[in-house]
Amino acid sequence: MGLIVSIFNIGCAIGGIVLSKVGDIYGRRIGLITVTAIYVVGILIQITSINKWYQYFIGRIISGIGVGGIAVLSPMLISEVAPKHIRGTLVQLYQLMGTMGIFLGYCTNYGTKNYHNATQWRVGLGLCFAWATFMVSGMMFVPESPRYLIEVGKDEEAKHSLSKSNKVSVDDPALLAEYDTIKAGIEIEKLAGNASWSELLSTKTKVFQRVLMGVIIQSLQQLTGDNYFFYYGTTIFKSVGLKDSFQTSIIIGVVNFFSSFIAVYTIERFGRRTCLLWGAASMLCCFAVFASVGVTKLWPQGSSHQDITSQGAGNCMIVFTMFFIFSFATTWAGGCFVIVSETFPLRAKSRGMAIATAANWMWGFLISFFTPFITGAINFYYGYVFLGCLVFAYFYVFFFVPETKGLTLEEVNTMWLEGVPAWKSASWVPPERRTADYDADAIDHDNRPIYKRFFSS
């Protein structure tokens, strides 16, 4: 059963890598429609399976392939269409819709819990056809990426796309300036030709550094331990008398969903780096309390007597579970997708995002598959593993993840090429906006000891 559930993540990893190029060839919108169709095929295979576990298994993989493509192409399209001042907010909405889907899934499971036949799981799968229909219908109204249109020589369509996104006329001076900036950046990239998979290892153009950062950030999103809570939360709730796992799921889903609304504001108000740093710090504190109370207080007579629990300890752990989910949903849940969608140059974007997102799915598979075995062996000591990962996440973000708030995608690329230290990136100014008192050398280089960089930034 664990493999059937977690194999979905493997399909997602495959789909992101294999299907990401569809968006480069046929456009982001057609790409999204295509991968959604693949997702529907997977759902259809699952819902028609009767006493054939292998058919359901295959359907899970195929639907995962479709979702993997969506996870790459959707943030990609949003980041390329959105105006820079709300780009983070709009990419964050991708995560918000994901949490809404999780919440609705929990509600559906609760509504069908009294069925004891195939109806219980087929209703939830059947609703997936509705979400796919909404997705395809929505693509009819979304403008195509102006960067893709310029790349394939459809300049006038690109201007109309920018016009629609910014709600200004095609002749607006600001729009034309943005168009010229995008076109100039694409022309420079065209001189180097299309990026190959091997070029993702290039350090000269800083592509490898960006791929590495994307992989680590997406991996750390899973290693924050959020899925640990979604899996193990029912055990804690049982300790205080709430034994219905369906109700437990809804409570967690409500906190997760409504916390994501706050992230829509914070990601643009405070910036990507700040959100990730504060998120890692707050989740670290939550795990320290959660794991320590679980190890020392939840079972007064030891883990061998799990039927005897401390309600006070259970209540404390539930409170910090909710704090953790709030901290995760408002920072790392969508923040890593925002940063990855803004980081890569256009010519390497689909491949770079695919690799980074695949890392997320692979860690999702490993955690969902092995968590039952690990928690069965070491119980709440498992929390200290994630605590250690969060310590690493905090320092990694501080030293290696630059701020991209308020910059165009072309300006983000310039910042990477200049080699601006991550802890100084919030002060970096694009060349065309620099004044006489701007000290580029002071921003681009920092010879201070590491501890001084950390405490003075």
UniProtKB/Swiss-Prot annotation:
Major subcellular location class: membrane
GO MF annotation list: D-glucose transmembrane transporter activity
InterPro entries named among the record's database cross-references: MFS_dom (IPR020846), MFS_sugar_transport-like (IPR005828), MFS_Sugar_Transporters (IPR050360), MFS_trans_sf (IPR036259), Sugar/inositol_transpt (IPR003663), Sugar_transporter_CS (IPR005829)
Superkingdom per UniProt: Eukaryota
Topology relative to the membrane: Multi-pass membrane protein
Gene3D superfamilies: MFS general substrate transporter like domains
The keyword Electron transport appears for this protein: no
Signal peptide residues on this chain, from the entry's feature table: none
Sequence ranges on the Extracellular membrane side: 24-29, 82-87, 144-247, 296-319, 375-379
Compartments (UniProt record): Membrane
GO (cellular component) term, any one: membrane
Residues spanning the membrane: 3-23, 30-50, 61-81, 88-108, 123-143, 248-268, 275-295, 320-340, 354-374, 380-400
Cytoplasmic membrane side: 1-2, 51-60, 109-122, 269-274, 341-353, 401-457
Keywords: Glycoprotein, Membrane, Repeat, Sugar transport, Transmembrane, Transmembrane helix, Transport
Residues with glycosylation annotation: N194
Family as reported in the entry's similarity comment: Belongs to the major facilitator superfamily. Sugar transporter (TC 2.A.1.1) family.
Chain's role: Probable glucose transporter.
Protein name in UniProt: Putative hexose transporter 12
